[in-house]
Amino acid sequence: MATINQLVRKPRSMKVAKSNVPALEACPQKRGVCTRVYTTTPKKPNSALRKVCRVRLTNGFEVTSYIGGEGHNLQEHSVILIRGGRVKDLPGVRYHTVRGALDCSGVKDRKQSRSKYGVKKQKA
């Protein structure tokens, strides 16, 4: 335990919080260009072909972003918007692609949870 005199001379230092999404640089989303669109397999015990893409952001970072939903229209040179949010079973994937923004279309025939997949309300 430090004495009061020691604390007067050198106060306690605050812990520095480390960001989980450093490439966003404290922004809610960032724009970027796809450099590679591919599938990858998750960690054990899961099994699938997860759709991901490498993205070169406007601030110069190159990150891997997950493409959620069934089917997508992304290819190399597509301009997309990314947000934070990791994928637990894909190591190194710390960002999500925002569906329905810029070149990334919304999920076709989506009826529920539409706002998460960039789908407009259907006309009755």
From Swiss-Prot:
Residues recorded with modification 3-methylthioaspartic acid: D89
Gene3D superfamilies linked: Nucleic acid-binding proteins
GO molecular function: rRNA binding; structural constituent of ribosome; tRNA binding
A Gene Ontology cellular-component term: small ribosomal subunit
Keyword annotations from UniProtKB, A to Z: Methylation, Ribonucleoprotein, Ribosomal protein, RNA-binding, rRNA-binding, tRNA-binding
One matching Pfam family: Ribosom_S12_S23
UniProt keyword NAD present: no
SUPFAM superfamilies documented for this protein: Nucleic acid-binding proteins (SSF50249)
InterPro entries: NA-bd_OB-fold, Ribosomal_uS12, Ribosomal_uS12_bac
GO BP terms, alphabetized: translation
Stated family: Belongs to the universal ribosomal protein uS12 family.
NCBIfam families from the UniProt entry: rpsL_bact (TIGR00981)
Entry function: With S4 and S5 plays an important role in translational accuracy. Interacts with and stabilizes bases of the 16S rRNA that are involved in tRNA selection in the A site and with the mRNA backbone. Located at the interface of the 30S and 50S subunits, it traverses the body of the 30S subunit contacting proteins on the other side and probably holding the rRNA structure together. The combined cluster of proteins S8, S12 and S17 appears to hold together the shoulder and platform of the 30S subunit.
Quaternary structure note: Part of the 30S ribosomal subunit. Contacts proteins S8 and S17. May interact with IF1 in the 30S initiation complex.
HAMAP family: Ribosomal_uS12_B (MF_00403_B)
Name of the protein described by the UniProt record: Small ribosomal subunit protein uS12
Gene name for this UniProt entry: rpsL
